């Protein structure tokens, strides 16, 4: 079960989330609905660790997610999947993953290899398609 209590997230002086609370029960579908700028994406990014909460609680399977790295949250079973399908169509799946890892890694050779292995561990389907051109992936596969 995912439980969010009194969640506050701010961007400078702008309070994007102001005391949001809800519970998403296991086996149930929960939706987040709101107008543009209402904070839906901020909520999802905060739950997945991509934004820091100023205050409040987020628990998943009775464990706190507050302050955890996004990678740790993904390993626990929660991932933020952006709406876009941004891939470089002319490159292979493996080359796209390598390009994506360049933006977050410091020690190029070993860290890139590790990043690719982590992605394949999370998404074995991409490992099967590693040599395939990324432009031939389905929409869902591109979001992996």
Protein language model features and the residues they cover:
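Short beta-strand immediately N-terminal to the Walker A/P-loop
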Residues: 30-31, 80
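The feature captures the beta-strand-to-loop junction immediately N-terminal to the Walker
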Residues: 33-35
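Conserved ABC transporter NBD signature motif
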Residues: 56-65, 76, 110-116
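Conserved ABC ATPase signature
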Residues: 133-137
